[in-house]
Every structure is written in structure tokens, then in C-alpha cells.
Amino acid sequence: MATIEVRTSAPEKARSLLRQALGREQRLLHDAVIRTHARAEELAAKTRVDLDALRAGLAPHPEEQDMELLELEGELELLDRIEDELRILETLEICP
């Protein structure tokens, strides 16, 4: 695991601020995951597409659903990115 060094004249205060900021960012990302997942599920139900099949590239793309499916694919990509960021944040450790 890599180490990131922060230099400050107020280490205790900086440590506290960093912990608060990381916690706040984790909560925001967690909420974003919930909202984005709900939106993806809503679009999947509307288009009657299986999310696993869509992710695997196996779902048909009827022309009349093209825009909805593009939106759904965008939501799934966004969900993946948000989940990746959240996983990274959850591995961060602030050392004394």
C-alpha cells in the first residue's frame, strides 16, 4: 500500500479535518450509489432489460428504446465509477 504524506503545522487539527472530510465524502458517495442504482433499476424496469445482459453486451437494442438504453448504460457506467471511488475511500487510513 502506498503512503501519502501531508505536512502541516497543526497535525492534530489536520488529522481531524481529513477524517471528517473523508467521512463526508464516503456518505455522499454512498448516497450517490443508492440514487444511481435506483435510477438504473427504474430505467431497467421501464425498458424491460436485464441489467446483467446489458452489461455483458447481450441485450438487444430496439430502435424505439435506443435513448432509454443509452441513458441506462450511462447510469451503469456512472454507478461503476462511484462504487470504485467509494471502495478506494474505504481503504484509506489516516495514520498518527
Where is each model-derived feature located?
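Short acidic DE-rich linear segments
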Residues: 93-96
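Amphipathic alpha-helical coiled-coil segments
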Residues: 22-36, 40-43, 72-75, 79-82, ...
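Short, charge-rich amphipathic alpha-helices with coiled-coil/heptad character
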Residues: 1-24, 57
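Short hydrophobic/aromatic segments of transmembrane alpha-helices and their interfaces
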Residues: 10-11, 37, 52
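Alpha-helix initiation/capping motif
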Residues: 10-11, 28, 62, 66
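Short E/K-rich amphipathic alpha-helical oligomerization segments
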Residues: 41-63
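Short, glycine/alanine-rich amphipathic alpha-helical segment
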Residues: 56-77
